[in-house]
Every structure is written in C-alpha cells, then in structure tokens.
Amino acid sequence: MASNATHAFARTDRTALGLWWWTTDRWLLGATALLVTLGMLLSFASSPAAAQRIGIDDQFHFALRMCFFATASSVLMLITSMLSPRDIRRAAFFIYLGAIAVMIALPFIGHNAKGATRWLQFAGFTLQPSEFMKPALIVLVSWMFAEGQKGEGVPGVSIAFLLYFIAVALLLIQPDVGQTVLITIAFGAAFWMAGVPISWIMGLGGVALAGLGSTYFLFDHVHARVQKFLSPDQADTHQITRAAEAIRAGGLFGRGPGEGVMKRHVPDLHTDFIYSVAAEEYGLIFSWSLIGLFAFVVVRGLYKAMKLNDPFEQVAAAGLFVLVGQQALINIAVNLNMIPTKGMTLPFISYGGSSMLAMGLTLGMALALLRKRPGAYGASGEFGFGRADA
C-alpha cells in the first residue's frame, strides 16, 4: 500500500493524478490548504458564541457545518484544478448562465434577509448564486478580451461589457453594492491586463466612481453605513466598535483559544467579523500572519499568471487572484474600521456555504490555468517543459 501511494506521486507516474500533482503549483495549493485549515480552526472559536446568540443548543453547530463546507470546497477545488483551460471556459459559461438565471428569479422566489434578496433557500441550506457568478464572469470576460485581440471579427470587448453589465444590474436589484464593487474592480483589472488603452480604463474608472457615489443616494442601507463610518458619534456603531475592541484586547499573542470575551458581543462574529475573533484569541502576530498568507497567495498567483504565454490564461488567472485578494482586503479593512461596513466574507475563513464553495471553485480555476503545460510558460523552460514548438 505504501509503495503504491509513493508511486502515485513519483515523477514517473503518468496517471491523471500523478500528472496533476507534478504540474500544479504546490506552494499555492499548500497555502490554500492552510487557509482552509485555519478557517475550520477559527470556526470552533466563533461557533459557541454565535450559536448561543441565536438560540441554537449545539454550540458547535456552525463549526461542524463549516467543516463540511470546507471539505466540499476542497474537493471542488481539486477537481476543478484538474481541468484544461478549454474545460474551464466551458464550465464558466454554464456556471454564469445558471447563476444569472437564478439571480433573475430571486426577486420572485428568493429568501429576504436584512433587507436584501440574495439567497435561494432549500432543504435547510441557502445558496447565494452571485458568489458563483463572480469567478465565472472573470473567466468569460478574459476569454472575450483574448478573442477580441485576435482580430478575427469577434466583438470581444463589447461582449465582455455586456456580460459585466448584466451581472451588475442583477446585483443592484438585490441590492448588493459590495459584490458590485468587487466584480467591478476585478473586471477593471482584467480590462487593464488585456492591454486595453488607458483612456478606456480611465473612462471605466470614472463611470465606476460615479456609480459608487450614486449608491449613497439610491440605497438607504448604503447611506446609513457611510454615515455611521463618517459620524460614528452620531450613529449606532455597536458591531464595529466591539470588533475593534476585540482586536485591541488580543494584544500581540491573544487571550488564548476559546478565551475571547468581546466576540460574544459581535453579532456577525462567525462571518463578517471572524478576523476580529482571530485577533482577540490568537493576537496581532497571528492576524498579521493571516494577512501575509493571503498576500502570498495573491502575489504568487499574479506573478505566475504574468509568465503565462496565452492571453486568455494570463488575464483570467490574474483576474481570479485579484478577486480573492480584493475580497480579503475589503473584509479585513471593515474589521479594522478603515471603510464602511459591508457584509462580505473573508475567503476560506468566514462561515458560509456559498462563499466556501465559490472560493474553492475560484482557486480551482486559477490553479488549473497556472498548471505546467507544454508551451504554457516562456521559452526559458522554467518549469521543465519549454515551448512546444522549440
């Protein structure tokens, strides 16, 4: 048994699993596995207080569900990372269509929570289709940008903008301004990396800023959150105040596992404010290391993406890592009271089935695009292949 297991990961193994293992970026794979593990660890720290707050008898209710979602997310990531770039495009096409179809139906059959209709509820679970739409959108617009560059009459840029505006319109109907901002940033990054003229990018940025400003006047919850951020003395800032106190209370080394006190007063401690739980129980050194781990994943992912030869693979992989990094940045910035509050999860760390599965899909797609293939990277042969036509 041991010899068979060893052979499965030997360089001479030509099975699908063996080829996957030796062509996948194992540094990124390991860093992602560490994030998933930390997410499960922190769920056991936050679950008792979260369960008690909403009257659930099983104090590890959220932790056990988190472990289930983390396992499912890991399996999804591994399966997706084995796909070819062509299969990634196909999967993104069908995922985007499915997610958009459900988002269109949400106003009629969706579950409303906190004034927004973003979820489909069934069999005790809730599904947020916009989470799956995000990586699919980035892959599709990257594909369209690449097709447009070929000069074969495909209106790639126009199709990419159409896909983007459809997604934005449906997000604003829910409403979900945070996800709109997130996909706009990732779309803009893909737009820039595709080599679009800077004047177009500046125009897109201007429109995006104008649109973001208009949400302050169009949506009451956005107006309220911005006002709380700008005038904390004149508004109820209980949650963000308690989160900040939790971070300060942890000091450098934290109170210790399970010893957090301030987390009991943070309503969304297991989701949006899990970072403050990490800081209180494990300290600033741990929470800074968590930021460093996210930075490693994003920076290494972007570095590898920039070395790819194929325009689609390069832009799509980079866009997916921007998506992950920006979401982590927004969540942590909210916890540190640097920006107005926004219900956005910390990738792989916060509790949430849709978020966990979608992040597994996102990183799986990115890992698949970064895999070592003949001709995928430069002629230097950095990854042992060299160009196919060399």
Swiss-Prot record:
Changing residue 180 to A: Decreases interaction with SidA. Changing residue 145 to L: Decreases interaction with SidA. It is found in: Cell inner membrane. One of its GO terms (biological process) is peptidoglycan biosynthetic process. Interacts with FtsI, FtsN and the cell division inhibitor SidA. Peptidoglycan polymerase that is essential for cell division. NCBIfam families: ftsW. This is Probable peptidoglycan glycosyltransferase FtsW. It comes from Caulobacter vibrioides (strain NA1000 / CB15N). The lineage of its organism: Bacteria, Pseudomonadati, Pseudomonadota, Alphaproteobacteria, Caulobacterales.
